[in-house]
Amino acid sequence: MAGIKALVALSFSGALGLTFLLLGCALEQFGQYWPMFVLIFYILSPIPNLIARRHADDTESSNACRELAYFLTTGIVVSAYGLPVVLARKAVIQWGAAGLVMAGNCVIFLTILGFFLIFGGGDDFSWEQW
């Protein structure tokens, strides 16, 4: 039952993060849908770690494949935070919309991290807890 509660909490936090993102786009005073491009970063962020977890050997203390995956994931996450700032600096979107998108980024990336911390400990394909 603990797995179900964790899954419900993660889905609620994901919905909250997407609500912040949609508010940053759809409110009447903002009205620009350019910040929706951060959805691409949400989709891309777990992929390097999934690939590295699948192909990495855990016997070494330092693993180049896993460290490259951490580097790529960091670049994707920083890009998700940088896109609204660049759009706001170029006056494509307003700063209020950028703030809402960044709040959504925080919630979504913490949700992704929470998913892998809760459900990712075991084999490469150990999603059987839920």
Swiss-Prot record:
Its name, as the record gives it, is Leptin receptor gene-related protein
Q: Which residues cross the membrane?
A: 7-27, 32-52, 68-88, 99-119
User: Its family?
Assistant: Belongs to the OB-RGRP/VPS55 family.
- What is known about what this protein does? Involved in protein trafficking. May be involved in the down-regulation of membrane protein levels.
Q: Which UniProt keywords apply?
A: Endosome, Golgi apparatus, Membrane, Transmembrane, Transmembrane helix
- What's a Pfam family in this record? Vps55
Kindly give the membrane topology term recorded for this protein: Multi-pass membrane protein
Which compartment or compartments is the protein found in? Golgi apparatus membrane; Endosome membrane
Has the keyword Transmembrane been applied to this entry? Answer: yes
Point out the gene that encodes the protein.
Answer: leprot
Chief subcellular site? Golgi
> What's any one GO cellular component for it?
Golgi membrane
InterPro entries per UniProt: Vps55/LEPROT (IPR007262)
- Which terms does the UniProt entry file under GO BP? late endosome to vacuole transport via multivesicular body sorting pathway; negative regulation of growth hormone receptor signaling pathway
